[in-house]
Structures are given as C-alpha cells and as structure tokens.
Regions:
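Intrinsically disordered, low-complexity segments enriched in glycine/proline and serine/threonine
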Residues: 7-10, 33
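Bacterial N-terminal signal peptides
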Residues: 9-21
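OB-fold and OB-like single-stranded nucleic-acid-recognition modules
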Residues: 23-122
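N-terminal secretory signal peptides that target proteins for export/translocation
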Residues: 1-7
Length: 122
C-alpha cells in the first residue's frame, strides 16, 4: 500500500481513538445552571455550618481534602466535581467559599447523590 495512504490511515485512526476517549471521559447528564452557596460538605452535613461566620473553617476543611458542595435556597445539595483531570474544582471554589455563586455544568444523579461537573463558576 502507498506510504502516504498508510500515514493518512494512521492519523485518522489516532483521531478516531482520541474522539472515543473524549466521549467516554465526559460525564453523562443534563446541562444545568444552579445558584447557591459554596460550602464544605463535612461541616454542612454534620452540623449545618455555613455562611460568612463559617468561611475560614470551611476553607480550612476544604484545603484538608473535604468535599466542596453547593446549597441552594431550597436546601438542595450538590457535590461539586471538576471535569479536567478529575479534580473537584477546588481552585475555583476555595476562594468563593461561603459566597453565593452560579455554577454551570453537567448534572449527574446516581445512587441518591447529585453532582455537578463544573464548566464555569460566576
């Protein structure tokens, strides 16, 4: 077979393979915009702790590795997840702890847990 054709087939094969990897790496769910307060889930779930008075504690807990969540006005709780490198979006959300933000992303519900894979935070 012609070397140029072989090279072209190789490039096409690699691109198809990468496309399949990307498709499987993206979470499956609906795109949503959710407004709520950024909280550390440990303190919020354990004692309902949130708000400006709890901000420094929440930052410390999140830096220690506790999960970060979003609580809406209706007390709906979402775990915050990142898409890139499976990171939980800490870089963006740590500085917004105890603030009200709008998160855009992909909502996934499974086993009683609802999580948003973050696309943007405003």
């Amino acid at each position: 077979m012609n070397p140029k054709v072989m090279r072209a087939l190789g490039v096409v094969s690699v691109l198809l393979f990468l496309g399949v990897l990307i498709a499987f790496a993206q979470p499956k769910g609906e795109t949503v915009k959710v407004k709520g307060e950024v909280v550390d889930l440990w303190c919020f779930l354990e004692g309902g702790d949130r708000g400006a008075d709890h901000k420094q504690c929440a930052i410390s807990c999140a830096k220690a590795g506790n999960p970060i969540g979003l609580v809406t006005e209706k007390d709906e709780v979402y775990a915050m997840m990142g898409i890139k490198d499976h990171q939980p979006g800490r870089e963006v959300l740590l500085e917004k702890m105890a603030e009200t933000v709008t998160v855009e992303g992909t909502l996934v519900k499974k086993g009683g847990v609802q999580a948003i894979y973050i696309s943007s935070v405003k």
